[in-house]
Amino acid sequence: MAKRIIYNEQARRALERGIDILAESVAVTLGPKGRNVVLEKKFGAPQIINDGVTIAKEIELEDHIENTGVALIRQAASKTNDAAGDGTTTATVLAHAMVKAGLKNVAAGANAITLKKGIDKATEFLVEKIKDHSKPISDSNAIAQCGTIAAGNDEEVGKMIADAMDKVGKEGVISLEEGKSMTTELEVTEGMRFDKGYISPYFATDTERMEAVLDEPYILLTDKKIGLVQDLVPVLEQVAKTGKPLLIIAEDIEKEALATLVVNRLRGVLNVAAVKAPGFGDRRKAMLEDMAVLTNGQLITEDAGLKLENATLDMLGTSRRVTINKDTSTIVAEGNEVAVNARCEQIKKQMDETDSTYDKEKLQERLAKLSGGVAVVKVGAATETEMKDKKLRLEDAINATKAAVEEGIVPGGGTTLAHLAPALGDWSSSNLSGEELIGANIVEAALTSPLMRIAENAGANGAVVAENVKSKPVNDGYNAATGEYVDMLSAGIVDPAKVTRSGLQNAASIAGMVLTTECIVADLPEKKDSSSAGGGMGGDFDY
């Protein structure tokens, strides 16, 4: 296909146009008074949403070059989402501000490479400062505050996540389900999560989120490699008759068998998903045995004289629900407490008997996985559209609280970044010079952009609010919900330090890449043929 090649200023301006479009559509959602965005869906009802990264993923422009700009900023949002699970809108606003200021300087003749160096040095300085400012989380009250802010000021959600963390521990698994009622409820059940995702993306049942969700599945556990599809056929036939889904957890599934499973899944013959077993060697077998206990099934292993081709339905485990994405699998089981407790006691005995610190650590890990359970939040809403929005907000809140537990919290509402701007100005003027200093100044100017946008969305003057906040003590900021200047930590307006840090780093990274772009190669738009006259309908005849 023919390509279009654009150089220099023209290339950067085209990228900028795409970036402007995406940044504006995402920025309207920022802050407690941020608005919603409606996404049109090809099938089903439109989706009303307040989540930056979801909006960013939906935007596709007709112009290929502008679309490249959209994709770059989308990357800042999705990388922040992968690292911290929240703060995607902030990352987008920061990246946009840095790109706009940087392009002005490049157009005026500044050297883009030196500017990028300045941006990188300023970012390193700020990351250290954010670390110094962060306060470790000590009680469930702080966890609740974090969840509340991330869920768009929903106190009920914040409290529920704090309760869930109390029950399953800070490392515990919190899973989301669509509830059957109007209210959102919390339930703690047996279950476990392990770090292996689906073997093939074709197993995903929800292609938008790339997740496989199996309700009340049978679970086949085996410690052997499945190479021949003939070994699986008897089990597949038995499960297909019941009409229930099947999850296969095995050491590995080789090409032929995997292809057969995928084809059956795509044709709708059997809802099946396959996952590699976690761990290695003896530890893998022990973890599979733990899963067998949890799901009330048997581990099909030749050590116990069991062969895959002779497996029957009563050897398979069952669970209430299994959720699998590309990296992790979560099994939510129920009604098997006695066996699980007995297995936990057995692991504790092994821990007492072993002298090796490594073995103790691994046994402790298994014990935590088995005994910790899974907190299931059942999302309640009046309509499906509200349910989807609520689910995304809850997901942000869960991710934000986990990030807060990891790296602590900082004052929220864009306050921390705004307060760091003067400190960065002092540091850069004494440590950097020339165009590197200009690069640092670009970052300094961008630091107030999230706060300004939050204020503007609440109907205040962003520039005035930003200057007022800078002149106040470090923890003081602007509460956009009430329009007052308050101590953010006391008011419970907090952000996880990890979210603030990731957003800043990803924004600076993308800004640096855009500024140093000198050429774009993109597809030429396809020419549409003007439709020729149909057969038997002579083009030039008069009728």
UniProtKB/Swiss-Prot annotation:
Entry's Gene Ontology molecular function annotations: ATP binding; ATP-dependent protein folding chaperone; isomerase activity; unfolded protein binding
InterPro entries (alphabetical): Chaperonin_Cpn60_CS, Cpn60/GroEL, Cpn60/GroEL/TCP-1, GroEL-like_apical_dom_sf, GROEL-like_equatorial_sf, TCP-1-like_intermed_sf
E.C. designation(s): 5.6.1.7
Enzyme class: isomerase
Localization (cell): Cytoplasm
Coiled coil: none
Reaction equation(s) it catalyzes: ATP + H2O + a folded polypeptide = ADP + phosphate + an unfolded polypeptide
Pfam families listed in its UniProt record: Cpn60_TCP1 (PF00118)
Keywords from the named record: ATP-binding, Chaperone, Cytoplasm, Isomerase, Nucleotide-binding
GO biological process, one term: protein refolding
Any GO CC annotation of this UniProt entry: cytoplasm
Keyword Chaperone set for record: yes
Residue positions binding ATP: T29, L30, G31, P32, D86, G87, T88, T89, T90, G413, N479, A480, A481, D495
Family annotation (PANTHER family): 60 KDA HEAT SHOCK PROTEIN, MITOCHONDRIAL
Family classification: Belongs to the chaperonin (HSP60) family.
Function noted in UniProt: Together with its co-chaperonin GroES, plays an essential role in assisting protein folding. The GroEL-GroES system forms a nano-cage that allows encapsulation of the non-native substrate proteins and provides a physical environment optimized to promote and accelerate protein folding.
HAMAP family tied to this protein: CH60
Oligomer status and interactors: Forms a cylinder of 14 subunits composed of two heptameric rings stacked back-to-back. Interacts with the co-chaperonin GroES.
Protein name according to UniProt: Chaperonin GroEL 1
Species name: Prochlorococcus marinus (strain NATL2A)
